[in-house]
């Protein structure tokens, strides 16, 4: 059984944070939820984070600054930035993916996260490819 990937999920809106946390946990991810950028930086520094998912507009350390700090500490850590303000993304950001609130389906967010985590891990080794092909074959029979 492969270990769960850990996602640092950050939003000052408790309802949005809760919804994303539940959605990610039901897909098998471990989620560390933080309500501000300062908490998120502390959590990231403790280690074990595979991906960062953050809102842009937050008091104190905003999402763009949070991603900048995280990329300084760990450039390979993928980051997803979410905002209700599309124009904001036109400024320079270190986020790997930008999604506009209300303009994406949950399935799109989940797929973007999956792809970023695969890229971080790197290509599968030949043995992993054989195992995943066998797993897919068995799944289609079931």
Give, region by region, the residue ranges found by the protein language model:
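Conserved acidic segment of CheY-like receiver
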Residues: 4-15, 20-24, 52
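Receiver (REC) domain active-site loop signature in two-component systems and cognate sites
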Residues: 58
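Short amphipathic alpha-helix used as the core "switch/output" element in two-component signaling
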Residues: 42, 64-76
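Non-catalytic signal-transmission and effector/linker regions of two-component phosphorelay proteins
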Residues: 1-6, 107-142
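Short hydrophobic/Thr-rich beta-strand motif most characteristic of the beta2 strand and flanking loop
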Residues: 28-35, 43
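Acidic catalytic/metal-coordinating carboxylates
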Residues: 35-39, 62-65
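Active-site residues of response regulator receiver
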Residues: 55
């Amino acid at each position: 059984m492969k270990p769960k990937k850990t996602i640092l999920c950050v939003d000052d809106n408790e309802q949005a944070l809760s919804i994303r946390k539940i959605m990610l946990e039901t897909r098998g991810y471990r989620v560390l939820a933080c309500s501000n950028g300062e908490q998120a930086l502390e959590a990231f520094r403790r280690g074990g984070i595979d991906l960062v998912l953050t809102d842009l507009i937050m008091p104190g350390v905003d999402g763009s600054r949070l991603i900048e700090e995280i990329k300084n500490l760990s450039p390979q850590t993928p980051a997803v930035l979410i905002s209700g303000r599309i124009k904001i993304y036109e400024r320079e950001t270190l986020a790997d993916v930008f999604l506009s609130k209300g303009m994406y389906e949950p399935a799109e967010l989940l797929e973007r996260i999956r792809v970023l985590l695969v890229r971080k891990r790197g290509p599968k080794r030949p043995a992993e490819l054989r195992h995943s092909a066998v797993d897919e074959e068995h799944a289609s029979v079931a």
